[in-house]
């Protein structure tokens, strides 16, 4: 690729800086780590790999990177694209082959959302493979907008106040998931992917399901952002500034024991009759 324009250079620096800040803030990568980068062939995971390869060069610690793609046997999946790209980069990689596509198509009725089952099958396979190769961290390409969308999806449809944490220990206790792009917005990632000309692989299984709940929430957030620029960032910051005493979860705050503090100074003010 040729010389970057001023704007492209600013964008690249911004993404690298924000990813570096997220990695540092949540202690995502430590000295000696083996980071398994989950590469789907989409803009987010390509950007993730690109940013982490740069971080590997400049970080004051040593860590390994291994790229892993899961071939789910979707019809028309271009098997040659990722190996060719990764060989050119000189990155160690593995292609994990597992026919989850057939499982999903068999179990999910036509027209119904496949994302949930597909995600669970993929996640379980990748967790197992990470354990097999001795990966200490599993890096995913979720960004700030994904996190905010998930927050609203859980609120609207599951009645829970949760999102995607930048760092997570899996339920099995053997895998730590990290999201280095947690501070990066999707618009920047899309622009970066465009000028870097990553060889994007479309998802034939879930990418065409335009009526997904996530897409509805995404459109809602985009509309809010158009009307009030900066709102998405403000919502994301709120996830880092939680005040349990101002919510209603009795497991997080002991409301039942709240009593008047008899030692507190009185607020009464002497009133002078006029």
UniProtKB/Swiss-Prot annotation:
Compartment(s) where it occurs, according to its Swiss-Prot or TrEMBL record: Cytoplasm
Pathway: tRNA modification
Note accompanying the cofactor annotation: Binds 1 [4Fe-4S] cluster per subunit. The cluster is chelated by three Cys residues, the fourth Fe has a free coordination site that may bind a sulfur atom transferred from the persulfide of IscS.
Catalytic activity line of the entry: cytidine(32) in tRNA + S-sulfanyl-L-cysteinyl-[cysteine desulfurase] + AH2 + ATP = 2-thiocytidine(32) in tRNA + L-cysteinyl-[cysteine desulfurase] + A + AMP + diphosphate + H(+)
Cofactor(s) essential for the protein: Mg(2+); [4Fe-4S] cluster
Keyword Iron-sulfur: yes
InterPro entries assigned: Rossmann-like_a/b/a_fold (IPR014729), TilS/TtcA_N (IPR011063), tRNA_Cyd_32_2_STrfase (IPR012089), tRNA_thiolation_TtcA_Ctu1 (IPR035107)
Short sequence motif named PP-loop motif, residue ranges: 40-45
GO terms for cellular component: cytoplasm
One GO term (biological process): tRNA thio-modification
Chief location of this protein within or outside the cell: cytoplasm
Assembly and oligomerization: Homodimer.
Its biological purpose: Catalyzes the ATP-dependent 2-thiolation of cytidine in position 32 of tRNA, to form 2-thiocytidine (s(2)C32). The sulfur atoms are provided by the cysteine/cysteine desulfurase (IscS) system.
Protein name stated in the entry: tRNA-cytidine(32) 2-sulfurtransferase
Species whose genome carries this gene: Pseudomonas fluorescens (strain SBW25)
Gene: ttcA
